[in-house]
Regions:
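Nucleotide-activated chemistry modules centered on ATP-dependent adenylation/adenylyltransferase
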Residues: 1-265
Length: 265
């Protein structure tokens, strides 16, 4: 069987590709996402998609980017209502997928939105059910994100340098993501202010944090290793004797619900 597959982004295609191959299902892709804003972000996501195409050599049908199509689709809803806005957006993309599928002779369609941890499967299935009746086409359903697929997909993207976006796509989700980031940052600063008695701003989100050169280890002994969780450096270089006191091993370490690469010297 070969299906017409709407692709929302490269990371979600990674999950869908694996499940489809496991079920011996071939697919033609349709990267249709006029919701993505700004255009530079659209280009980054499309380039990531093309990178996967180069790796897996799948068929593709394309259509020009037109952000106005998304804006028109959400005119009747309150854009601040994320659930209603997203439903309209998904409907628009899935309906366009069905139209293109029929135009190209396909009788079955699906979408990588089923891979996304952000999307509600019941909403997707309800949309699909309506489109099946309206256009006389079949929808292929599979829980692409099941069985730890999201974690495995993230590892694949990291190893293969596949771009992973930080927000859903539209300008409204960009603002929402930025607001969440700001709230998280303020919360971290508030916690750190109780742990550290100096200006720690420059130590937050560092690419490389050296202990004891950048951070006096006394703070770790006084406030606990969770100080690192709130500083969130990408990589930590730590003296062996300090690491031993906290039972830290060379490589990936989990501190609370946060993971970091720690190099012991």
């Amino acid at each position: 069987m070969k299906i017409f597959l709407h692709v929302c982004c490269a990371p979600d295609l990674v999950l869908a590709h694996k499940k489809l191959k496991e079920n011996n299902i071939e697919y033609t892709t349709f990267f249709y996402n006029p919701n993505i804003y700004p255009f530079e972000e659209y280009e980054r996501r499309y380039e990531a998609f093309l990178k996967l195409k180069g790796m897996w050599n799948f068929d593709e049908k394309s259509i020009d980017y037109n952000h106005k199509e998304f804006l028109d689709s959400i005119k009747t809803v309150d854009v601040k209502n994320e659930q209603k806005r997203c439903y309209k957006c998904m409907y628009m993309r899935m309906e366009k997928t069905v139209i293109e599928a029929k135009k190209n002779g396909y009788n079955v369609f699906s979408t990588t939105l089923l891979s996304s941890p952000r999307k509600n499967h019941e909403d997707i299935k309800n949309i699909a059910k309506e489109l099946e009746k309206r256009y006389n086409i079949k929808f292929y359903y599979n829980n692409f994100r099941s069985n730890n697929a999201i974690s495995e997909g993230a590892k694949f993207c990291k190893i293969n340098n596949i771009y992973r976006q930080q927000y859903c796509g539209c300008e409204y989700s960009l603002i929402e993501a930025e607001n969440i980031r700001k709230k998280s940052l303020e919360k971290r600063k508030k916690v750190l202010s109780k742990m550290l008695d100096f200006d720690f701003t420059e130590l937050m989100n560092k690419d490389l944090l050296k202990i004891p050169e950048d951070l006096y280890p006394g703070y770790l002994y006084e406030s606990g290793i969770e100080v690192l969780k709130y500083l969130k450096p990408k990589i930590i270089i730590m003296r062996r004797e300090i690491a031993k006191d906290f039972n830290i091993k060379n490589g990936r370490n989990k501190i609370g619900n946060w993971k970091s690469k720690i190099i012991i010297v």
